[in-house]
Amino acid sequence: GMAADMTAQSWVDPERFPLLRRRMYSTLENPNLLGAYAVMIISILTAFFLRERQKKRKWAFAIILFVLLLCLALTYSRGAWLSLAAIVLGLTLFYDKRFGFLFFLIPLVLFFYHGQMVERFLSLFSGEDTSVGLRFALWESTIAMIEERPLLGVGWGSYYLAYPDYNFFIQDEHVLIFHAHNMYLNMLAEVGIIGGAAFLLTFFAQGFLCWKLYRGKASLFTRTLGLGGLLMVMAIAVISMSDHVLFGRSISFCFWSLSALCVGSGDW
């Protein structure tokens, strides 16, 4: 049953990370999806934490943020960790430049802490990580897919059907690859330049509209939603470079629902 399937999955490479036993994924079946969900909620909640004036609510937001950050750390999702940096960058650019000092903590943590989290993060640059190698191979195949059908693509949701014809790496017909582990390449491959441009325009338009809300003269609540929505779009834009998290229906539903909530709160 479902419990047995969840117990059997660990999402780790025991040869590359022998001390890493399990990655948290909750009911989302994949740690990267849980990481994407966490950064979306962190984005919105951070905005409300910063703008909240009532002490009790601020403490409540702080506790929930701490739990979410701990959860994000335990996913061991490097893409999600990098998207957290995008949230900090967004706060630096659009809220308070002093948040930029948080980036100076990264080398300090890497220097003094040598646990599994640091080892997993640094493996991005080692050239020996299997998941990184797989992604480069998938991107090479996806680029070939785009070059062959640049305008209209292979068809919406048909990546897994087209991939075997461009399989340069796995060479196993029983392994299904559902997406390119890169939202940008995946959209271009499935719906071509025309459809891909339309999708990406719609995606980044959410961030632009949220920015307009945040910089506008609406209520404090609406401007806070605007800031949170802007941070969320920046975070998903970054994590989508190494995974196609919006392929997951639960994550996609959450993202577009939160986008609708943020954008719809404005008096356009």
Residue ranges and their predicted role:
Residues 85, 98-105, 227-268:
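Transmembrane alpha-helices of multi-pass inner-membrane enzymes
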Residues 1-22, 26-94, 98-109, 205-212, ...:
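Alpha-helical transmembrane segments of multi-pass inner-membrane proteins
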Residues 26, 30, 140-143, 149-152, ...:
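A conserved mid-to-late transmembrane alpha helix and its immediate loop/hinge
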Residues 75, 91-132, 136-148, 156:
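A membrane-periplasm/extracellular boundary helix in multi-pass inner-membrane enzymes
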Residues 60-61, 219-229:
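Membrane-interfacial loop-to-transmembrane alpha-helix junctions, especially the N-terminal start
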Residues 12-13, 18-19, 125-140, 152-191:
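Long extracytoplasmic/lumenal interhelical loops at the membrane interface
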Residues 28-31, 75-79, 177-182, 243-254:
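Membrane-interface catalytic loops of GT-C/OST-like multi-pass glycosylation enzymes that act
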Residues 208-222:
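Alpha-helical transmembrane segments
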